[in-house]
Amino acid sequence: MQSMTSSGASATTEQQGRVPLFSTDAAAPDGLTPAEQERYQRDGWLGVYPLLTPEGVSYTCQVRERVVRGFMAPEWLARSRDAKDLELRPWFKSMHAYVPTFYDITCHPAIVNRMVSILGPDVIAWGATLLRAPVGTTHRWHVDVEHRHWDGVSVFLGLENIEPRSTLKVISGSQRMPEPPQAYGIIHDDAQALTAVRAQVPESEIVPVPVRPGEFFIFAGRMWHGSHNSATLPRIAMIIHYSRPDAHIRVPTNWDAPINWHPARPPCVLVAGEDRAGVNRLVERPAGGRQA
């Protein structure tokens, strides 16, 4: 049984003394209020909350630029068959396990304490990636492959060029749908997605979440979400995934059924409580390697 180490609790410090990464407004509450818990159960998302300073946003984007090519991109996964492949070039959703800055963001109490209210006292971060959405890019309505196979909660942290035309969109209440959007085919059209959800959740609405750079929101892993960057600049955001330690975390190599799974065991970080299950590979804060 592994317990959370002090390194995970030290995330509020300035990043290596160089940059004030976290905003003084990034409160570390005891957890969600009763009203927030009720809203999460109803709507499936919460926020927005402050986290990073403007300098922290800029620094985080600089780190991404330096390290992103060292990770295995989605299009390469389909060609990977050997567990050793992800030792040489880690999964693109394992950035928090290799980059200290991303680890510290993932472990920040402003996020983790809220996760504990949703998931319980024991929480792991199993995925974190920084995505760049070029102008005109559409990410179809979907539920992440992983959260179709195990329960969890995600965080969307806005970094660069986040505005109403580029932010992530969610459909409120859609986490209660028995099927993900993928069961309805490839859906890019907002009206089509909303019609499908309203057939079972009549009060649902499409919400372009009003995140600004350095702010984050929380959403249920099974919530329908998508985006279309119709702004004039590329968007950069960080996506973080959390689950209970007894979830068996795996790496998918494709997006649509039937799902194929990579033989490698991805690294996970215990951000709260204890690992009472022992089914995942847990790692400590990275000291070097793909660092910044």
Mark where each language-model region is.
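Non-heme Fe(II)-dependent double-stranded beta-helix
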Residues: Q2-D43, Y49-V143, R148, W255, ...
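A short secondary-structure junction signal
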Residues: T137-V143, G152, S166-I171, E179-A183, ...
